[in-house]
Amino acid sequence: MKALVLHDSGIDYQTDREMPRLTSCFDVLVEVHFAGICRTDIGIAERNIPAKANIVMGHEFCGRIAGFVNGDDEMEGWHVGDVVSANPMVFSDKGDMMCGKECDGAFAEYIAVPHQALIKLPPYFLSPLGAYLEPVAAALAPLKHIDGRDRVCIFGDNRIAALTSQVARAMGHQHIERVTRLDALEKDHYDCIIETEPAHIDAYVDALKPGGLLILKSRSFAPSTIISNTIAMKEICIQGTRYGDFGVASHILAASAHGVKHTLDTSTLFGPVYELSDYEKAFTEASLPRNKKIFFKLCAE
């Protein structure tokens, strides 16, 4: 099958990659239709994020169930042909793993995942919309920590900041401000800051009120320098986030697909769709933070 595989020398486009083997843990075979390029994928490709060698990259995807480890057409309430995505954080007998980082991912014609990780999607999600489920779920994560806080800022001039801002609006958080420049941050001004650019931790702490909350949205592996005295004296809390509810993310995307106001404007979020063989151009475009989300189309359907 076609796949993008990580090697020490970079990304290798293969046309003869072996099909995934189903096991008792990775028990569902999914035919991938669309997959999105994430900042994590870029970091892995640039060797800034550690990842297992010789794995298929990618973790944002949608597709159809193609088979089960038991050889039947159904298993645990799932059926061959169901349109699905998956939570890329999978739990197996080898521990917690992330698709495209510790185990084979979605930049391929097929992916094997645990049935517990599947998220069922409506048929019209068999498009870039379905591959966008994981980013929306990730953008939901910080919002569960901001209730009751008056002044909330999302900082960043990048795709994830733009998405998080739109998801916050879709969830009814009208009081959230998006800031894209450091010089626009006011000292002791915010109750909460959601960061999407990890290089400016001290600036965020300075802009928070005493007792404020800093939510870490980015997943950088680069070391960050902080002045702990300021954090201690201002009694700042730091909160990490991973994912919100994938079901809620699906509802947000469905609402945007049906033109519901105050949801997501995918025209400002979705960029071009590339064939897997055009991966070099796709990754180059995706590496520019202000550019829209870039997708691969894997299936001819």
Locate each region found by the language model:
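Glycine-rich phosphate-binding loop and adjacent beta-alpha segment
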Residues: 200-258, 298-301
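Glycine-rich beta-strand-centered segment in the early N-terminal region that forms part
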Residues: 20-35, 46-90, 122-125
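N-terminal Rossmann-like NAD(P) cofactor-binding module of classical short-chain dehydrogenase/reductase
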Residues: 85, 193-194, 215
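Mid-domain Rossmann-like dinucleotide-binding core that forms the NAD(H)/NADP(H) cofactor-binding site
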Residues: 126-187
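Cysteine-cluster motifs in flexible loop/terminal segments that predominantly coordinate metals
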Residues: 38, 75, 85-110, 114-119
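Residue-level marker of beta-strand positions
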Residues: 27, 60, 82-83, 110, ...
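C-terminal hydrophobic helical "lid"/dimerization subdomain
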Residues: 246-301
